[in-house]
UniProtKB/Swiss-Prot annotation:
It comes from Glaesserella parasuis serovar 5 (strain SH0165) (Haemophilus parasuis). Gene3D superfamilies: Bira Bifunctional Protein, Domain 2 (3.30.930.10), GAD-like domain (3.30.1360.30), Nucleic acid-binding proteins (2.40.50.140). The gene is aspS. This is Aspartate--tRNA ligase. L-aspartate binds at residues 172, 218, 449, 490. GO terms for molecular function: aspartate-tRNA ligase activity; ATP binding; nucleic acid binding. Its main location: cytoplasm.
Amino acid sequence: MMRSHYCGVLNRTHVGEQVTLSGWVHRVRNLGRFIFMQIRDREGIVQVFFDEKDEALFKQASALRAEACVQIKGEVIARDTSQINKEMATGEIEVLVKELVVYNNSEVLPLDFNQNNTEEQRLKYRYLDLRRPEMAERLKTRAKITSFVRRYMDDNGFLDIETPMLTKATPEGARDYLVPSRVHKGKFYALPQSPQLFKQLLMMSGFDRYYQIAKCFRDEDLRADRQPEFTQIDVETTFMTAPEVRAMMEKMIRGLWLDRLNVDLGEFPQMTFAEAMRRYGSDKPDLRNPLELVDVADILKDVEFKVFSGPANDPEGRVAVIRVPNGAEITRKQIDEYTQFVGNYGAKGLAWAKVNDVNAGLEGLQSPIAKFLTDDVVKALLARVNAQNGDIIFFGADSEKVVTDAMGALRLKVGRDLGLTDLTAWKPLWVVDFPMFEKDDEGNWSAMHHPFTAPKDLSPEELVQNPKGAVANAYDMVINGYEVGGGSVRIFDPKMQQTVFGILGINEEEQKEKFGFLLDALKFGTPPHAGLAFGLDRLTMLITGTENIRDVIAFPKTTAAACLMTDAPSFGNPKALAELAIQTTVEKES
């Protein structure tokens, strides 16, 4: 027998037992008469010790380095009260070693387990980084999340059905990863950005409730919460309304938080996209932060200060403020830093006013823009934001997009900087009623979610007449400022689907080429269907309390979409490329 117990499960109930443990040497202390070691495995750490009375065993133990892989056999002993380590789950006991087997000693480590290593080091030696208890715990949590999801789905009649990994390139927003075909030279498969069309086809096939823990691929610029390959909890249903889908998925997430964190999230509030953008400057608002954007264009439209009155009178403009309680303590240096910060979002500056005496109107303000304001304007402004003595008010005035983006980002930053954001809280919500379409950089319509999302209460003819005003029957689940899931009711009428494609600039020939199979399927008794997908990586990131998605993926890529451990991607073998009829335009570096 190579193991009788996991290291991390031993406790006082095992005192007197003979145990066999296998794992890694976590830490060594040689005190002369005794050698104390911490032995670690997947489930935790336990202290073992060697007595110098057994000379051969003591000598063998003396040669061990950290991260040596060993087996020990010994007796579980209760520690003296003074020696109990309350920081360790196994801190009430230790193991007197009687036999030692060294499976493999370790060379000097390229990582220091007790120090902060660079992310580059951690990714290059990922197999060592994953031995760290906090990393092991995160991946164990991930496994328990997927186990919970599978149980919930099974209990609610969902079928786990796999969809193809080699599929057809379709416009879903990001670039595809292409896979060349050897048999069909010059042609390429695409790795799926999501199982979207296949899960819709499964609903058309009558499977009613589908789910899949699905690997997805997107060739896009990466951020801290993005990876080129990621995992979705993918869900689709027939004959369920959007509120019914949301209720079922909300119940799952509430159950998951209760299971993993013993936290009751309560019933999720619901907010429209328009309200979220107006009040928080984001379609994924972090409700732990009490600060809000307040529109004041109507108050400032007649002031002589063109920086305010210009956008206030522009139909495409916006003037909004953020009141920061007790923000008068913010220094001029901090204000300058915030001014530079909002510049990253296109803002040309950041006006501000400190409220020294709310009852004194204009005279009670300390602000470089006070000279441009009247007493009546100031009083109306202070009343609108419910200002108090000691507050600071930040102003944003520009195009609607610039103000919304800049002030939304400033809200988050100030909330963090001043400790206003309650980092211990959980604040979930549903964001609903998204615009159906948005303009891209070239002024053309693009789908805000994807081209298969149904509009709310519109005929194809009405949609064509007013695409700008169309509201999608779409919904996102947001927790603490992270979009953890999103979905919609799908189009199940072929005419509506063709209409949406047309608005997006996809002509009939292109529709037939790229989506002919879908348009054909829609003709044969397609049922109403809806669904959504959760980001498993992002859910795990939230539940484990890390802010880097790479911490919850076993073998992640860098922000340059590279694997430092395996050196992927790499140049293709010339013979293999020739078989695929591929010639590269980039020369391999010598």
